[in-house]
């Protein structure tokens, strides 16, 4: 299936694809043993894994931005952008649970000992029992409904996992190891994720400028995922991959164990709040919106 773009006006550019309800109907048929007739429609839920402590920005989810904790900005954004999906917060501390619960959001207490957000997600879904799980990061306050719906559409297809990417526009970002790159096959499946510049431009000795980056398929991976429940449950038991351990990118575990990851492309910007400086950038974005 070829790639398609989501514009800021949320119109799809590119080949016409089956509506998401048709994909869900086909999935429902498979859940019903291939039989026609009444079937239990598979469910999709958004789960946000939340960890109180953070190395670069301690207790960042409770950091106040314009008088409101970052986690609340994220919760309200998701609820407003994608109200059609049930929303849960998988938390590891009572302070996080109380922060979302007092505002009417559902919170699930999970073990504080999880090694990754994906493990926390899997524990929470044993309570939620969704067939498809969309993972929005707790520090991504500008996620859009179009992005969430694209993830739901992709994971309802053949691949057990989906994620999003956006084109690089600046060489400095492309060369930054903190901005993860993804190489995408012609059918939309991920070929490789890396912190290194991908592709490496041999004819230029690796030297690139903004114009070159903007004109070539250089994609930044966004930390938004969707999982089929069976893969999510299996993830924790998969052996860590060699490249995962080198790059410190857990999505490589999925590829190294032979599973496909579909990649959707989006032009919507995101701001991951990893540092106090990022929090200031988000506040500036709020000011710009008025």
Walk through the language-model features, giving the residues of each.
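N-terminal glycine-rich phosphate-binding loop and ensuing alpha1 helix
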Residues: 42-91
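Short phosphate-binding loop-to-helix
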Residues: 88, 94-153
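Hydrophobic/aromatic residues located in beta-strands of well-ordered beta-sheets
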Residues: 46, 87-89, 162, 190, ...
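Conserved alpha/beta core of the MobA/IspD/sugar-nucleotide pyrophosphorylase nucleotidyltransferase superfamily
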Residues: 207-290
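Short, low-complexity intrinsically disordered segments enriched in A/P/G/S/L with frequent Arg
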Residues: 7, 14-16, 22, 28-29, ...
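A conserved hydrophobic position in a structured secondary element of the catalytic/binding core
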Residues: 91-92, 143, 227, 274
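Conserved core of the sugar-phosphate nucleotidyltransferase
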Residues: 144-239
